[in-house]
Amino acid sequence: MTTLKTSSFSSLPWDLVEDILARVPATSLKRLRSTCKQWNFLFNDQIFTKMHFDKAEKQFLVLILRLYTVCSMSLDLRGLHDNIDPSIEVKGELSLIDPHCSSRKTFVSKVFHCNGLLLCTTMTGLVVWNPCTDQTRWIKTEVPHNRNDKYALGYGNYKSCYNYKIMKFLDLESFDLEIYEVNSNSWRVLGTVTPDFTIPLDAEGVSLRGNSYWIASHKREEIEEEEEEENEYFINDFLISFDFTTERFGPRVSLPFKCESSWDTISLSCVREERLSLFFQDDGTLKMEIWMTNNITETKTTTMSWSPFLKIDLYTYGHRFGNEVSFLVDEENKVIVCCDEEEDDINDTVYIIGENEYWRKEDIVQRSYRPRMFSYVPSLVQI
């Protein structure tokens, strides 16, 4: 790897220096902070960090939330099609110290990723965390957490910098929609919302270009009271989005397949910060489909088109994934990597599934409750 030296840049115009540094990966710039005060000041500038996030080559790492801890993962699939076994390993814990907890250990129950920032729900509240720079912002909430509370991290898209915000709502018949602005360090109530949709309790949201997306269902208000118990789990019908610039829920996004049963498995993921991806498995046939949106270049996405990425019949393996499954798409190797909880297993399990009925099962570590694997992009974003 080429080493950057401050002396090499001393004769260059400052604008050119900024442009060069804006194209260097975040993890490399992190090591340069102590070499030059002027560079360190630049790396803390919001306008530069936005330019860097837009221009720099993205590094895609894999993290996993397990046992209330965020850990790094090593995932090497390069020799997959040359009959070389993949390498999968859970590495060390990422250090996140809770100043409000006597044990100092932070117990993280949920994670939401956006632009290199992690919004973590903990036992004592919320924290926005940049693992690359080790910055944290601990956020007070007015009332104790409700297990139905949903939080999302996103940003208003402005020319000079990103205005990061947290959206909170409680998925009830009606709720107060709340916004926390990172810049002002304050909460505000947007108003009471009576939605015509519901988001399943175990549905994990994802961020794409500053907006948040969830799998959602129609409100079944026509269901008779005596039928409610049978229809406790509604059929997932569409995606719902939240636009952090307009601070409104967006239009529904149609799914590329038809759910016939509430037991069908659906999960949502993001592919290389460019597209959304859907995991679908039919409960009856066990056939699995992976769909991806076509490239999204605009912040406001009122319509999306979908293309199939992978279709596999898992009936031979007799395996049914649950809705808590998390997955990553590897476009180069034409496979997906899934992490699922096995009721009768003593370990967390990773599955690699690909074309020509490629199927590989890897036990990684001792079993945890609903492990969640996700892609992480290091950034210099300031909080």
Swiss-Prot record:
Keywords (A to Z) from UniProt: Kelch repeat, Repeat
Pfam family for this entry, one: FBA_1
Extent of the Kelch repeats: 110-158, 160-211, 349-383
F-box domain residues: 6-51
InterPro entries for this protein: F-box-assoc_dom_typ1, F-box-assoc_interact_dom, F-box-like_dom_sf, F-box_dom, SCF_F-box_component
UniProt keyword Ubl conjugation, yes or no: no
SMART domains in UniProt: FBOX (SM00256)
Record-given protein name: Putative F-box/kelch-repeat protein At1g62270
Organism: Arabidopsis thaliana
Lineage: Eukaryota, Viridiplantae, Streptophyta, Embryophyta, Tracheophyta
